[in-house]
Amino acid sequence: NIEKHLGGSLIRFYFKDEPYEIKNNEHFQLQLLLSLIQPKDSMTAGDSNSHQLLKLSKKVSEADVTVFINGPTGTGKEVLSRFIHKNSRRSEKPFVGINCAAIPENMLEAILFGHEKGSFTSAHKQKSGKFEQANGGTLFLDEIGDMPLDSQTRLLRVLSNKEFYRVGGDKPIKVDVRIIAATHQN
């Protein structure tokens, strides 16, 4: 069982914030991008560190676990998340990404969970959120560290219960989504 081998239900990647590492990460990003356009079984790495990361990422992709990627801006966190999705059993389902820092706080929950018609002033029709759009696939939450704490709490409930309510809704919506979260914060 790969999940037991990897030690649990959450896997964390960390990219160091050092000039040497950043320089190497440029090469790593290129290798990851190349691997995304190559056949599913191939992996490309130019050095042993990149090869080890790709090898671990491939194992992680086979386990249906939540993934947390931590590292500075520009180190390839989204590219790595796409690599994990592409090599997972969810690869034929949607990969949906959202930058949590770019969404106004008052709109974040409606974008993540959707909303019912009339739940707020401009809600003229029911709308599905990112969780529903990613159902069966992967939801990439970029800059999750910038998400307000109350939204993080609601997100934790979705991870625990595998269901949520749309804003203004009273019926739970079941969801099967793999979360890959990333941040530049420690």
Identify what each model region corresponds to.
Residues 40, 50-54, 72, 84, ...:
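Non-catalytic interaction surface on structured domains
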Residues 66, 94, 154, 176-178:
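Structural signature of beta-strand start/N-cap positions in the alpha/beta core
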Residues 97, 140-141, 157, 177-183:
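Structural recognition of the conserved hydrophobic beta-strand(s) that form the central parallel beta-sheet
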Residues 52, 83, 111, 154-157, ...:
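Alpha-helical transmission elements in cytosolic ATPase-linked domains
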Residues 31-54, 106:
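Dynamic helix-loop-helix/coil hinge segments at AAA+ ATPase domain boundaries and subdomain interfaces
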Residues 1-34:
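Interdomain "pre-motor" coupling segment immediately N-terminal to P-loop NTPase/helicase cores
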Residues 42, 58-122, 132-148:
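Conserved post-Walker A coupling segment in P-loop NTPases
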Residues 89, 119-131, 144, 148-151, ...:
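Conserved Walker
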